[in-house]
A protein has these predicted regions:
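Hydrophobic faces of well-ordered beta-strands that scaffold small-molecule active sites
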Residues: 4-13, 32-36, 66-73, 99-103, ...
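Structural alpha-beta junctions
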Residues: 30, 63-68, 92-99, 179-186, ...
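C-terminal alpha-helical cap/extension of soluble enzyme domains
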Residues: 188-230
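Structural motif corresponding to the early beta-alpha repeats
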Residues: 55-84
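Flexible, charged surface loops at secondary-structure boundaries
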Residues: 1-3, 26-30, 134-136, 154-156, ...
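N-terminal beta1-alpha1-beta2 module of alpha/beta enzyme domains
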Residues: 1-65, 139, 213-215, 222-229
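Internal, glycine-rich beta/alpha segment that forms the wall or movable "lid"
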Residues: 17-23, 42-45, 78-186
């Protein structure tokens, strides 16, 4: 039996309708972590609702029956002033047992990256190491995107890394570098949709798979979970 970690990324309007039912249904699946992302506007359709990342984390934390971890994929460090980022997001998130903290610097792919407070990613990482005990299997840290700079930081701080879609060849290349880390403080993971999953039936077990749940009806939501967690 595979010991591969399988997780999901919640769509922006997840909490608008039937959220309790949907949480109960995903709680039946053998999933590792439920991740939320950090957008102001729904990236699929601006007319759809979009959860605020802190509120989404709180809603998941308040779900008393949960059998899964909670994480961010990813928290945009440049969206808030540094003091607010630390006191309202980083500190509360890492007070949660086994929280999987993904960090990013934002881009303009789905929405204009404004405001941009140009916080230093390396400074934020340093703060986290000074104030929290991090490990791959408990409270952990990873970076969103396998750019050259993120690869450098991954190696320097022995943290995890995530790839958003892209090619299997690229994640395997990143994996080769990640495997050189002796005691990583976070996992290597791949965000993938149904198409990418169908194209690649087998992916190395040490890569966490984060399935992107698309915006859909409650019935289709169930169908997506059933497909990813057979």
């Amino acid at each position: 039996m595979s010991n591969q970690k399988k997780s999901i990324l919640l769509p922006g309007s997840f909490f608008e309708k039937d959220s309790q039912y949907k949480l109960n249904y995903l709680n039946l699946k053998n999933l590792h972590t439920v991740y939320v992302f950090d957008h102001t506007v729904n990236p699929v359709d601006s007319k759809l609702a979009m959860y605020e990342i802190k509120n989404a984390v709180s809603a998941l934390q308040d779900y008393e029956e949960r059998n899964f971890n909670i994480g961010t994929a990813v928290l945009n460090i440049n969206k808030r002033k540094l003091d607010s980022l630390i006191t309202k997001y980083l500190n509360p998130f890492l007070e949660i047992d086994n929280f999987k903290l993904g960090l990013g610097i934002g881009d303009n792919k789905y929405q204009e990256n404004l405001p941009n407070y140009s916080n230093s990613l390396e400074e934020v990482i340093g703060y986290l190491f000074e104030n929290f005990e991090l490990s791959k299997d408990s409270r952990s840290l990873f970076l969103g995107g396998n750019s050259n700079e993120n690869i450098r930081l991954m190696k320097k701080y022995s943290i995890g890394i995530n790839q958003w879609l892209g090619s299997i060849k690229q994640i395997y290349k990143t994996r080769d570098v990640y495997k050189e880390i002796k005691n990583p403080k976070g996992s290597i993971s791949l965000c993938l949709n149904k198409d990418l999953a169908l194209e690649n039936k087998i992916i190395f077990n040490d890569i966490e798979l984060i399935y992107i749940i698309r915006e859909s009806s409650t019935e289709d939501y169930r169908s997506q979970l059933d497909h990813f967690f057979k």
